[in-house]
């Protein structure tokens, strides 16, 4: 009897070998957002921490003699690998999620995968409060009276258990040479839809009279809602005028002091007439 042998070279493709995987659950674990929404199923963009859970009942099952190696949770641009277990629930958490699409991949030892996609019951497209523009000005460009103005936006909607709100707004100041901030006072913000604004005179280092004209200051506004805050810092220059003209007289290099009187007051400088220094002492 004769025997015949034939050799074939090729690639064997195993089909229908992706793991069986059909479900997982999630919950928010951020205590702050849970309090705002009233539960752990609503997700707040940028603040909720999403914990994804694969229970034993929902575990992935490999096919054709492969084994499950891991799960991979993907939310937006963030991802996390989670160890597989056949006899215990497994979970992983992605913090501060910015997408309402949660993808969980079950990956086997051959690299085959099956994805399950879910979305939260409620996804709140929250945006941080922000001061877009602000200014501080001395009245007339000189003097101690200072006006502060700013405008911005906030997320003016409800979370579920409570509505968003401006929780505080105040300003602080310091001289430009100092490192220590001083709280100036609270500010009453005007609301118009999602827009916020303020304009008014503010107290300073000389109380209700404002800010010392001989000094320059840093002034910053801090506004907060239930989740975020915005800080805007400005510089206030000194308020000493080169020339101050009043009904009672003229002052050079300073404000005219009515208590002193006189037609001409000169501060912090020498006086020259025809190139000659005048000595008043």
Tell me what each language-model feature is.
Residues 78-88, 185-201:
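Short beta-strand segments within Ig-like beta-sandwich modules, predominantly Fibronectin type-III
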Residues 15-45, 123-147:
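Short, compositionally biased P/S/T/A/G/V-rich stretches that sit at domain boundaries
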Residues 3-14, 82, 112-122, 228-242:
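Edge beta-strands of extracellular beta-sandwich domains
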Residues 45-47, 83-85, 95-97, 124, ...:
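Surface-exposed coil/turn segments at beta-strand junctions on protein surfaces, enriched
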Residues 247-281:
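Intrinsic low-complexity, repeat-rich intrinsically disordered segments enriched
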Residues 90-100, 198-217:
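Surface-exposed, short loops/turns at beta-strand junctions within beta-sandwich domains
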Residues 42-74, 153-183:
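Solvent-exposed loop/turn segments flanking beta-strands in beta-repeat/beta-sandwich domains
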Residues 106-108, 221-225:
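Conserved structural position at the C-terminal beta-strand
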